[in-house]
Amino acid sequence: MLNYTSASSASLTSDLSKSLESKHGIKTLGVQADLGTPQGPADLVAAVKQHFSDSGAFQIDIIVNNAGVALNNKIPEVQVSEFETTYKVNVLGPLLLIQAAQPYLPNDRSGRIINLSSVSSSTGFIGQSVYGGSKAAVEAMTRTWARELSERATVNAINPGPVLGPMYAANTDEFKAGIKGWIEHTPLMRARQGIDADELVEDAKTSGGRPAYTSEVAGIVGMLCSEDAAWCTGQVVCANGGMLMLH
């Protein structure tokens, strides 16, 4: 199941669904639902159950809580509306989704729940009082859920740093300048001529290095979803190229 919020993402979701079905021989479903609303997570689970329970049996094996927003402002500029939006999507959304999905999790510890946190929960990036706080809450919930759901699923979080995509592109020059020192000293964020895209190599001259590729972060998610990760729960697994070695 692929969740998206805005109608503008419908075609992208459809294209991704077709690609996954063709490549892996699986069934997919795109569901439009706003996880930042009280009813959104429950509606999402209901839609998935209706679509995939034609045989009578229904089970949710893997959940990746990836929805998130980042609204960066220093203390004097923080607005209550920004706080509410961020915590509704980043904190309340995952909680309500797990609440709605819990009845359908396995009963043999084989389930996998992966929460997307951020290095911001630990690094104290300037301008991320709200975002960093929301991701720290996600890490706290990860540990709680690991205990409450111990007979149903493992629950872990990963904490990426900058990742190539729309959220990274939306960062201001001021914010990028503020994290440049971190990037310069992150081992795997060094841009490589002839390996990384030319525009990333060029951007690294001012930003300090390149962001992670989505595939690099997804690989760690996949690892935690595997049977080999069955003895790992309640952990925050680094997925940031070594950025938190500075912490």
Where are these predicted regions, by residue range?
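Residue(s) in the substrate-gating loop at a strand-loop-helix junction
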Residues: 118
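Short C-terminal tail/terminal secondary-structure segment
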Residues: 123, 210, 221-222, 232-247
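Short, small/polar-rich loop/turn modules that mediate ligand/substrate recognition or access, typified
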Residues: 150-154, 232-234
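Active-site helix of classical SDR
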Residues: 98, 134, 142
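Substrate-binding pocket helix/loop in short-chain dehydrogenase/reductase
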Residues: 74-75, 79-85, 113, 178-182, ...
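Alpha-helical segment proximal to the catalytic Tyr-Lys
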Residues: 103, 146-151
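Conserved mid-core segment of classical short-chain dehydrogenase/reductases
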Residues: 42, 53, 59-62, 70-84, ...
